[in-house]
């Protein structure tokens, strides 16, 4: 039996293109990090984990609020119209709105993009939209994952999910119980 060398390239994964994409993310993230974001390690992108220093945030009895979401079938619309920046913005909005309704101030955001094949320009549009959504929401993109999975996703298909974290004082949280007592809907836009 002859041994063959298994490589990412043979499996259909383009590490060089993925690295180029991470470099793009790091570049636009650093450029778009809010100057007041003294809590953020500005070199998070590309690391295996991301840090955010909450010890300097002046909130009494702080609670961390987290949310994760996706954009669902809007992905099909983005593919149909070949427009991908708006789903990046929408992804951030879906996650951040879930923080805001609980009274939390968004701190940071992470993304997950799964693709069959890395299409650099498409991914650039998506991530540029995510960064724009973070700017609108006054939070920072601090990390994420881009997974190239040939054979799992068709070459033009992808999935997108996000994760956001915010902070609120325990006394200022909007719980389901409080919202039910008010007997009116809550609507948040960013």
Which residues does each PLM region occupy?
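Glycine-rich phosphate/pyrophosphate-binding loop regions near the starts of catalytic domains
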Residues: 26-30, 36-190
């Amino acid at each position: 039996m002859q041994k063959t060398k298994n490589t990412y390239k043979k499996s259909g994964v383009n590490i060089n293109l993925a690295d180029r994409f991470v470099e793009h993310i790091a570049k636009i993230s650093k450029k778009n990090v809010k100057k007041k974001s003294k809590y953020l390690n500005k070199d998070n992108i590309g690391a295996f984990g991301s840090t955010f220093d909450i010890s300097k945030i002046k909130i009494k009895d702080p609670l961390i609020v987290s949310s994760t979401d996706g954009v669902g079938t809007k992905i099909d619309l983005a593919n149909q119209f070949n427009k991908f920046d708006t789903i990046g913005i929408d992804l951030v909005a879906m996650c951040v709105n879930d923080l805001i309704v609980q009274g939390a101030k968004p701190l940071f955001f992470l993304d997950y993009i799964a693709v069959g094949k890395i299409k650099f320009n498409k991914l650039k549009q998506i991530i540029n939209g995510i960064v724009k959504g973070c700017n609108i929401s006054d939070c920072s993109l601090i990390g994420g994952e881009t997974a190239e999975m040939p054979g799992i996703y068709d070459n033009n298909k992808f999935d997108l999910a996000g994760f956001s974290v915010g902070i609120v004082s325990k006394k200022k949280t909007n719980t389901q119980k409080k919202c039910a007592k008010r007997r009116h809907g809550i609507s948040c836009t960013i």
